[in-house]
C-alpha cells in the first residue's frame, strides 16, 4: 500500500492503528483499529460528522474498544493489514479519485469503513450512519472544497477553529454592554454597506475602545438595530494566535488563512471578519519564498468579496500600513478618539452593574466620577476609558478582599485572646491564683465581645451576599428577557419584567433595610466603593498622595516650616515659600497645568540651598534619596543637553531614554533639583521652558512626560561674591536696607545671565542670606546630634560642654564658605582626636565621654 497519496492526518490514523495493535499484543490490523485511529487523530472531522448525523461519538468509541479487546492476541509477530483493512484503504483511494481529490483524507477512510462489509460497518450502521447522510455531512464539512494538500483536514471548519463568533458571545451575554460610540458605529455601518472596499479600519490609541465598537456592532446586529443589508450578518473575530500556533510546515499558515478567507467569501457577505491588531498580518508568515499574509487578503479586500474590520493603533498604522499603499487604500479609516470625561462617566455607569455583580460590592456614583477625574489628571500615559475602568475594577477587587477578610477589630480581639491564653498557661505553672483569676475574667469578657462581634460580622456578610445573589439573578433574568424578546416570546418577557424582576427588587430593598438596621451607626463591613477607595488605588499606582489627609498629616503640613527647620537653619523666606507650595498642592489648590512649585535659590556656598531640597524630599517621601538630582555642571557642552531627554534616533543610547524624563516617568511625584544652573549650557534652559510653563516634556521617543506633580528647585551661586561683600557692611540699623539692596543687585545679575522668558516662568526667586554666628552654633548642635547618634550605635555615650560647642562654632565659622567648614572642624578637632583616644584606651568607652574646651582645642575625659 502506497501511503504517499494519503493526507498527513490519514497517515497518522493508520500509524495510530499500528501502535494500538502493538500495545494490545495483537498482529492483524483490523478495520476496528483503523476506526479507532481515525476517531483519535481526526476529532474535528468525526465530531462534526457524528453531530450532524445525531450519533453518540462516545458510545461508538466504547463499542469499537470492546470489539478490539475481543480480537485474538498473538505475540512476537509483525503487525500486518488484514484482508478487510486492505480493502478499506483501497476503497478509500477509489473514493478520493471519484470525488476529484488529490489525496486520501479521513472522510474517504470513514466512508470506506461504512461501505466495506465488516464488524465496523455494522457498528456504524447500528449507530445510525447511512452512506447518503455521510456523503451529505462530508459535503457540508468541506463546503465544496477539494482535498488539494496533505494538510487539508486542518482547514475544515476553519472559521470555527481560527475565529471567535462575536454574535454568539453577545447572545450568551459574554460581551460587556457598549455605551456611546454611536457616531463611530454609524460610520462603520456606512463603510460596510459599500459595494467595494467595504473594509473599515479603526484607528486610535490603546484603551480608547476600538474592540468595544465591534462588540457594539455585534450587539446591534443581534437586536436588529442595523440597516437592512446588514441584518442577520455574523461577526467573527480572527484569532491570530490560533492561526499561527502549530503551523509547522512551510506554507501551512498561509493555507489556514486562505481557507478562512475562502469560507468568508463563500458566505457571500453573511460573515464580517474582525481582525484585531491587524498590523500583525503585515509581514506575518513572510519568509524565503513565502507570501506576506496581507497579500493573501488584498485581492479579496479590493473586490469587496471579503468584508473585514481592522483595528490598530496610530503608531502601528504609520509603521506598517502607510508604507504599503496598496493595502492602505483597501481600508477606510474610522478615527477612534479618546472620549471626554462626561462620555467616560456614562460608559462607567453603564458597566457599573457588571463589575458590582462580579465583585459582589456596590460602586457609588462619586467613585465613578473620581475614577474618571483622577485617572485623567494623574495617569497621563494611558487613555480613557480604559484607565478609568481599571481604577474602578481594582478598587472593587480591593474592597472585596477586605469584605472576605476578618474585620480589623475582630482580628485584634482574637490576637489578644491568644496572647492571654498563652499568659494563662504560663501562670498556671507558677500557681499564682489571684493573677489567674484576673486573666480568666478578662478572657471571658473578651470571648463574649468576640462572640458578639463574630455574630454581627457573619450576619452582615450573609445579608450582603444575599443582596448580591439577587443582583446576579436580576442580571440573568434581564438577559433571558432580551432573548425571549428576540424570539418573540412576549408572554415570558412580561412574566420576567413585571413579575420576577419586581419581586427580586422588593426582596433587595427589604434586605438592604434589614442590613441598615443591623449596622446602625457603625458597620463592620464596608460594602461600597467610594471616591476615597479610588484615590487610594491612584496613590498606589503613581505614588502621588491624592487620598484624603488624615488629621496627623494635616497637622504635619500646617507645621511644615518647623519640620524643615529641624534640618535647615535660618533661611525663613525660602522655607516658607516651599512649605506654601506643598500645602497648596495637598489642599488641591494648585494649577493642574503646572508643576507644584518652581524656585531658584541664590546665595553663597554652604548656606543650605541643596540641604533644603533634601529636607523637603525627606518630609514628602521619608527618604531624601527620592529626590531627582541633576548636576548642571555635567551639562556644560551643547551636545550634552540631549542627555536630559535622550539621544536622538541613530545615536548611541537612543533606547535608554533621558536622565530627566526617565526619572520622572518612574517617579511622577518627586522633588527635582537642578544644582548650580549657572554652569549649564544656555540650551538647557530652552528645554526647561515647557516644563515650567505646561508641566510637560517630550522625550526622544515622542512620549510626553508629566511634570505636574513635581517640585522644581534650581540652585545657583550667582552673585555670591557680591552678597558676601555686602553682608560685611551689615549693622543693626541698616540691616533691612542692605539686604534689600543686595537682593536687587543679585536679581539684576540673574537677569543678565538668564533670559527673561525663563525667569518669568519661575514661581519665586529666593536669596539665601549668609549664616550668622548664632546660626552656625545651631548647625554645630545639629551635626553633634548626628555624631552622638552614630557613637550610640557603637555603645559610646558623648556629652558636649558649652565651651566645646562655642569652640567648634568659632573655628567652624567662615562667612564666605557657610556651614561646610563646620563639618571639617568637627572632623578635625573632635572625631580625629576621639578616635585616637578610644583606640589607645585613654578614655573608657563604657562610661560617658565628656568633651570640653581649653581655648586652643578640645579635651576629653570620663
UniProtKB/Swiss-Prot annotation:
GO terms for biological process: cellular response to heat; protein refolding. GO terms for molecular function: ATP binding; ATP hydrolysis activity. Residues 81-144 are annotated as: Repeat 2. Residues 339-543 are annotated as: Linker. Residues 771-862 are annotated as: C-terminal. Residues 553-770 are annotated as: NBD2. Residues 3-144 form the Clp R domain. Residues 389-520 form a coiled coil. Keywords: ATP-binding, Chaperone, Coiled coil, Cytoplasm, Nucleotide-binding, Repeat, Stress response. CDD domains: AAA, RecA-like_ClpB_Hsp104-like. Residues 157-338 are annotated as: NBD1. It is found in: Cytoplasm. Pfam families: AAA, AAA_2, AAA_lid_9, Clp_N, ClpB_D2-small. Residues 6-71 are annotated as: Repeat 1. Belongs to the ClpA/ClpB family. Homohexamer. The oligomerization is ATP-dependent. Part of a stress-induced multi-chaperone system, it is involved in the recovery of the cell from heat-induced damage, in cooperation with DnaK, DnaJ and GrpE. Acts before DnaK, in the processing of protein aggregates. Protein binding stimulates the ATPase activity; ATP hydrolysis unfolds the denatured protein aggregates, which probably helps expose new hydrophobic binding sites on the surface of ClpB-bound aggregates, contributing to the solubilization and refolding of denatured protein aggregates by DnaK. The Clp repeat (R) domain probably functions as a substrate-discriminating domain, recruiting aggregated proteins to the ClpB hexamer and/or stabilizing bound proteins. The NBD2 domain is responsible for oligomerization, whereas the NBD1 domain stabilizes the hexamer probably in an ATP-dependent manner. The movement of the coiled-coil domain is essential for ClpB ability to rescue proteins from an aggregated state, probably by pulling apart large aggregated proteins, which are bound between the coiled-coils motifs of adjacent ClpB subunits in the functional hexamer. NCBIfam families: chaperone_ClpB (TIGR03346). This is Chaperone protein ClpB. It comes from Bacteroides thetaiotaomicron (strain ATCC 29148 / DSM 2079 / JCM 5827 / CCUG 10774 / NCTC 10582 / VPI-5482 / E50). The lineage of its organism: Bacteria, Pseudomonadati, Bacteroidota, Bacteroidia, Bacteroidales.
Amino acid at each position: 500500500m502506497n501511503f504517499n497519496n494519503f493526507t498527513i492526518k490519514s497517515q497518522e490514523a493508520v500509524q495510530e492503528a499500528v501502535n494500538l495493535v502493538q500495545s494490545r499484543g495483537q498482529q492483524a490490523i483490523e478495520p476496528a483499529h483503523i476506526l479507532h485511529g481515525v476517531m483519535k487523530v481526526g476529532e474535528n472531522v468525526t465530531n462534526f460528522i457524528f453531530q450532524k448525523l445525531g450519533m453518540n461519538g462516545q458510545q461508538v468509541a466504547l463499542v469499537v474498544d470492546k470489539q478490539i479487546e475481543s480480537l485474538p492476541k498473538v505475540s512476537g509477530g509483525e503487525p500486518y493489514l488484514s484482508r478487510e483493512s486492505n480493502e478499506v484503504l483501497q476503497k478509500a483511494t477509489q473514493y478520493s479519485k471519484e470525488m476529484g481529490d488529490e489525496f486520501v483524507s479521513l472522510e474517504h477512510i470513514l466512508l470506506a469503513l461504512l461501505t466495506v462489509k465488516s464488524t465496523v460497518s455494522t457498528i456504524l450502521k447500528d449507530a445510525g450512519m447511512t452512506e447518503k447522510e455521510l456523503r451529505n455531512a462530508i459535503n457540508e464539512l468541506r463546503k465544496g472544497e477539494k482535498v488539494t494538500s496533505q494538510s487539508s483536514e486542518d482547514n475544515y471548519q476553519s472559521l470555527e477553529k481560527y475565529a471567535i463568533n462575536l454574535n454568539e458571545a453577545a447572545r450568551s451575554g459574554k460581551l460587556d454592554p457598549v455605551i456611546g460610540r454611536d457616531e463611530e458605529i454609524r460610520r462603520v455601518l456606512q463603510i460596510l454597506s459599500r459595494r467595494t472596499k467595504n473594509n473599515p479600519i479603526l484607528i486610535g490609541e490603546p484603551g480608547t475602545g476600538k474592540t468595544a465598537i465591534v462588540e457594539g456592532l455585534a450587539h446591534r446586529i443581534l437586536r436588529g438595530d442595523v440597516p437592512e443589508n446588514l441584518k442577520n450578518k455574523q461577526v467573527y473575530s480572527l484569532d491570530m494566535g490560533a492561526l499561527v500556533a502549530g503551523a509547522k510546515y512551510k506554507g501551512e499558515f498561509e493555507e489556514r488563512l486562505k481557507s478562512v478567507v475562502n469560507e468568508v467569501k463563500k458566505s457571500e457577505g453573511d460573515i464580517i471578519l474582525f481582525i484585531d491588531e491587524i498590523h500583525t498580518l503585515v509581514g506575518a508568515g513572510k519568509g524565503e519564498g513565502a507570501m506576506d499574509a496581507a497579500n493573501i487578503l488584498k485581492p479579496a479586500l479590493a473586490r469587496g468579496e471579503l468584508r473585514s474590520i481592522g483595528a490598530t493603533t496610530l503608531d502601528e498604522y504609520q509603521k506598517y500600513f502607510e508604507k504599503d499603499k496598496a493595502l492602505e487604500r483597501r481600508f477606510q479609516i474610522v478615527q477612534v478618539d479618546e472620549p471626554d470625561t462626561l462620555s467616560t462617566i456614562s460608559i462607567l455607569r453603564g458597566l457599573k452593574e457588571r463589575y458590582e455583580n462580579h465583585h459582589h460590592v456596590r460602586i457609588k456614583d462619586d467613585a465613578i466620577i473620581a475614577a474618571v477625574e483622577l485617572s485623567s489628571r494623574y495617569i497621563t500615559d494611558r487613555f480613557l476609558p480604559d484607565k478609568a475602568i481599571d481604577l474602578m475594577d481594582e478598587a472593587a477587587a480591593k474592597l472585596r478582599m477586605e469584605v472576605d477578610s476578618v474585620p480589623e477589630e475582630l482580628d485584634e480581639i482574637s490576637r489578644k485572646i491568644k496572647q492571654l491564653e498563652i499568659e494563662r498557661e504560663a501562670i498556671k505553672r507558677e500557681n499564682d491564683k489571684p493573677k489567674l483569676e484576673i486573666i480568666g475574667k478578662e478572657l471571658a469578657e473578651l470571648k463574649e465581645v468576640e462572640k458578639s462581634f463574630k455574630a454581627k460580622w457573619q450576619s452582615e456578610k450573609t445579608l450582603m451576599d444575599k443582596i448580591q445573589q439577587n443582583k446576579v439573578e436580576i442580571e440573568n433574568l434581564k438577559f433571558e428577557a432580551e432573548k425571549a424578546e428576540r424570539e418573540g416570546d412576549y408572554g415570558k418577557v412580561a412574566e420576567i419584567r413585571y413579575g420576577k424582576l419586581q419581586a427580586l427588587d422588593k426582596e433587595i430593598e427589604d434586605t438592604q433595610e434589614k442590613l441598615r438596621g443591623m449596622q446602625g451607626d457603625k458597620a463592620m463591613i464596608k460594602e461600597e466603593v467610594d471616591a476615597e477607595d479610588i484615590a487610594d488605588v491612584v496613590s498606589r499606582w503613581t505614588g502621588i498622595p491624592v487620598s484624603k489627609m488624615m488629621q496627623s498629616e494635616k497637622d504635619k503640613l500646617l507645621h511644615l516650616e518647623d519640620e524643615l527647620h529641624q534640618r535647615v537653619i535660618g533661611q525663613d523666606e525660602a522655607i516658607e515659600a516651599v512649605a506654601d507650595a506643598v500645602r497648596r498642592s495637598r489642599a488641591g489648590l494648585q494649577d493642574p497645568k503646572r508643576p507644584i512649585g518652581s524656585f531658584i535659590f541664590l546665595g553663597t556656598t554652604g548656606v543650605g540651598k541643596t540641604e533644603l531640597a533634601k529636607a523637603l524630599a525627606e518630609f514628602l517621601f521619608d527618604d531624601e534619596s527620592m529626590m531627582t538630582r541633576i548636576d548642571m555642571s555635567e551639562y556644560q557642552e551643547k551636545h550634552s543637553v540631549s542627555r536630559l531627554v535622550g539621544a536622538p534616533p541613530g545615536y548611541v543610547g537612543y533606547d535608554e531614554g533621558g536622565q530627566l524624563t526617565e526619572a520622572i516617568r518612574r517617579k511622577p511625584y518627586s522633588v527635582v533639583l537642578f544644582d548650580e544652573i549657572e554652569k549649564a549650557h544656555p540650551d538647557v534652559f530652552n528645554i526647561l521652558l515647557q516644563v515650567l510653563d505646561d508641566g510637560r516634556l517630550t522625550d526622544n521617543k515622542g512620549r510626553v512626560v508629566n511634570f505636574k506633580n513635581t517640585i522644581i528647585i534650581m540652585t545657583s551661586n550667582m552673585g555670591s561674591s557680591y552678597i558676601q561683600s555686602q553682608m560685611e557692611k551689615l549693622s543693626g540699623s541698616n540691616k533691612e536696607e542692605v539686604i534689600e539692596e543686595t537682593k536687587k543687585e543679585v536679581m539684576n545679575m540673574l537677569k543678565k545671565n538668564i533670559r527673561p522668558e525663563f525667569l518669568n516662568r519661575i514661581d519665586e526667586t529666593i536669596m539665601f542670606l549668609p549664616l550668622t554666628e548664632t546660626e552656625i552654633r545651631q548647625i554645630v548642635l545639629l551635626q553633634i546630634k548626628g555624631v552622638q547618634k552614630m557613637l550610640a550605635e557603637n555603645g559610646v555615650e558623648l556629652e558636649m560642654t558649652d565651651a566645646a560647642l562655642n569652640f567648634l562654632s568659632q573655628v567652624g565659622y567662615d562667612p564666605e564658605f557657610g556651614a561646610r567648614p563646620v563639618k571639617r572642624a568637627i572632623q578635625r578637632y573632635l572625631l580625629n582626636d576621639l578616635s585616637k583616644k578610644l583606640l589607645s584606651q585613654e578614655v573608657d568607652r563604657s562610661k560617658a565621654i565628656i568633651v570640653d574646651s581649653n581655648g586652643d582645642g578640645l579635651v576629653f575625659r570620663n
